[in-house]
Amino acid sequence: MNDDIPSVSLPSGKDIPALGLGTWNMGEQRAGETQEIRSIRKAIDVGMTLIDTAEMYADGKSEEVVGKAITGRRDEVFLVSKIYPWNASAAGTIEACERSLARLGSDRLDLYLLHWRGGNPLEETVAAFEKLKTQGKIVDWGVSNFDVDDMEELFDVPDGNKCAANQVLYNLSRRGPEFDLLPWCQERSMPVMAYSPIEQGRILDNHALIHIAKAYQATPAQLALAFLLERDGVIAIPKSARPERVEENRGAIELEITEEDWATLDAAFPPPSRKIALEML
């Protein structure tokens, strides 16, 4: 891991980068594969070694692209993938993980997430995750798109408190997790992984964001990422299929924003004053 990238600790004590790379949509167009591989390798080169993918992304082709990109560099990477909820039965979880590992060309996942709540009992999924840990096929497991009530239900099942992370939709325009979910996870030393950290680009034309970013000779995307990196226990995983955009994203760690400017951003993107149901994309 690059020493310049801030780190976040898992419950196990392992430190992982607070800024990684998402791979949603990668693998959908064969013509873009070469550049996608270059982007993943650029992320590794600059210390953004947490690579997030899922069996859902491009029907597994995203995992295949990641596998090609990390060939010969597996030990440099913190590899995350996710399982469809309808695959997350006792036997289905094992089988889905093995398929993901085959596509990734890896013998293990560092973190395996249940993509969202589904019909399979949490007890079954958790037991299967723990079995995968025993088999050495995953190091840790976690969840995605779980709100506080989901997390409390999870912690009530056997071994549910071994959950290592929760990946949710969180960015300047969707600050609902700050009201209760983020504090809940922080109290348990559980990282929150923020997907769509720049709202798929939709927040980048906000006047306050543009104005403040210019004052720091930064881009609006860098400032939006810096907002998340300021939060304890939060990991941002922006997706980028272009190496130059990966470099831009990495620049977010250099920003030191004043309290006055954070207050201006709070006025433009108000923090929640009440419970907001967790949103999903």
Model-identified regions with their sequence ranges:
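Short, acidic/polar
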Residues: 30-43, 89-104, 124, 151-152, ...
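A short, structured active-site edge motif that brings together acidic residues
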Residues: 76-88, 111-115, 145, 168-170
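Beta/alpha (TIM)-barrel catalytic core signal, keyed to glycine-rich beta->alpha loops juxtaposed to Asp/Glu
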Residues: 7, 117-281
